[in-house]
Amino acid sequence: MESLKSTLKGALEAELARIPQPFRHGPVFHQTIKCFLYGMVKEADLWPIPDFKPPRMRDGGFIDLIGVDSSNAVKCAFAVGPVVELKAVKSLEALDLEEKWIITFSTLAKKVKESTFFLKPTIEHLHLEQK
């Protein structure tokens, strides 16, 4: 898992670094990460489904992207945001699968660190550094 995490971190950070300076802001980072994950999930022979709403979530939870196999079983799920949000953690916890990821991209390291309080042991957290 750690090698996948470091590989994914390096690839995503390189992708974000390519964004021209005038366009480097939250929504662009968010969508760029989602687009990258979409391609990665598709390359893994899974069908990427963006903006998934877990069926058991009544409060409007959402997950940015899931990967579904040929039997329609969810194999991986990703939530993306500047910091770890409780809503994202609850949405991921509603799914019964091993590969659950929260990817954060805020430049405010202290806020990201404070927000990891919400994380559960079953969720991988990946923070992307921006240069």
Region locations from a protein language model:
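Non-catalytic C-terminal interaction segments of nucleic acid-processing enzymes
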Residues: 1-7, 121-131
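Catalytic cores of nucleic-acid endonucleases
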Residues: 73-126
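A short, well-structured beta->alpha microelement
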Residues: 50-64, 83-87
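Active-site beta-strand-loop-beta-strand hairpin of nuclease catalytic cores
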Residues: 60-77
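Phenylalanine-focused residue identity feature
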Residues: 23, 29, 36, 52, ...
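Hydrophobic beta-strand residues in large extracellular and virion-surface proteins
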Residues: 8, 48, 65, 78, ...
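Acidic-basic catalytic patches of nuclease active cores, encompassing PD-(D/E)XK
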Residues: 2-56
